[in-house]
Structures are given as C-alpha cells and as structure tokens.
Curated annotation (Swiss-Prot):
Chief location category: cytoplasm
Species for this entry: Arthrobacter sp. (strain FB24)
Family of this protein: Belongs to the PRA-PH family.
Top-level lineage group: Bacteria
Protein's name according to its UniProt entry: Phosphoribosyl-ATP pyrophosphatase
Catalytic activity: 1-(5-phospho-beta-D-ribosyl)-ATP + H2O = 1-(5-phospho-beta-D-ribosyl)-5'-AMP + diphosphate + H(+)
Keywords tagged on the record: Amino-acid biosynthesis, ATP-binding, Cytoplasm, Histidine biosynthesis, Hydrolase, Nucleotide-binding
Gene Ontology cellular component terms for the protein in this record: cytoplasm
Length: 87
C-alpha cells in the first residue's frame, strides 16, 4: 500500500525520467494552470462523494485529489518538507 511519501517519491521519479505514456508527465506538461483546474475538479468530486456516496467512493476521490495535489507540488518545485512546515 502506498502512502503520501511513497507516492511523492514515485511521482518525483516520473517527473525526472519522463516515461512515455505517463499520465503524470502529461499532467505536468499541462502546466500549473492545467493541473490547478484538475485539482479544483477533483476537490468538487471529493465533496460530492463525501456528501452523497459511500465511504469507499469518498476515499477513492480523496486519493485522486492527493495525487493531483502532489503533481501540482512537483510542477511548482515544492517538496514535502515545504508543505509539512505549514501543518
């Protein structure tokens, strides 16, 4: 099972190596604006799932939001430590 740190490490590797066909690479290439739009979309899906769907559906949507937030972090050159210091 992945956790926040292992996901970030995996995404960082993909950002560095740019494997062909990678969803992460495609999203990074869409830039901060494109990634930001995806974050907003996923946040709305989290809300709707939490409000109207099962806990399992909400957890899945939250995991997708976390993925897109981490891609945004990579696009901005932010590390986990950059974020953790604000928690």
């Amino acid at each position: 099972m992945k956790n926040f740190e292992t996901l970030f490490a995996e995404l960082s590797e993909k950002a560095a190596t740019r494997p062909a066909g990678s969803r992460t690479v495609a999203e990074l290439e869409s830039g901060v604006h494109g990634i930001g739009k995806k974050v907003v979309e996923e946040a709305a899906e989290v809300w709707m799932a939490a409000e109207y769907e099962s806990d399992e559906a909400a957890a899945e949507e939250i995991s997708q939001l976390l993925y897109h937030l981490q891609v945004l972090m990579l696009a901005k050159g932010l590390t986990l430590e950059d974020v953790y210091k604000h928690l």
